Amino acid sequence: MWDARAVRRIGHRGAKGHSPENTIESFAKALELGCDEIETDVWLADDGRLLISHDRPGPDLKLTLQEVLDFCRGKLAVNVELKSEMSEKAAQETGGSVGKLLAERRDPDAYVSSFWWAALEGCRVAGPAVRRAFIFADSPDRSSLMESARGMRLWALHPNRTYVTPELVKAAHATGVKVNAWTVNEPREIARFREWGVDGIMSDFPERVPKD
């Protein structure tokens, strides 16, 4: 489903600007809006379920990652953000659980992303073939970041929109790593990122990301 010639239209938490985030309704809206991919958030619950929520899920939350993957399969790629409490152990367990599920499903259009290196490592151990992306919202040393990307065999970097630069995109591509920016809602910024060669743009209003 990846077209190297076009910028990916990625719906942030589905189509957050139009429908309640991280719901089947929102993912269906993203599909209606012509998204190539959706981003969603997953937590490992105490009972072992993988629950969909941006914040730590409450007792009434029931939507699971399995259900989202089933809905999206063959229609939308899925960027699964691995969420965790402030604990590397918990992050690694979450990554391991999601990595195991994705490896078992062998879904080529699903991958993981996280702020937590431990979560990405947990996924790598449980599902070595599952693609992984590192999320950041700061300005890390570029050479160190690329070295880490190579060492972790990352598929992509996911910088916050504030930290996207032409130099970052160029360095990532030279390393063999894609760049998917978040969360980009302003048309002028979307146009600028396209000019810089960003591979994917996550947006609350994904219809604003041109398809050609």
Please name every model-derived segment.
Residues 1-212:
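Phosphate-group recognition and catalysis centered on beta-loop-alpha active-site segments
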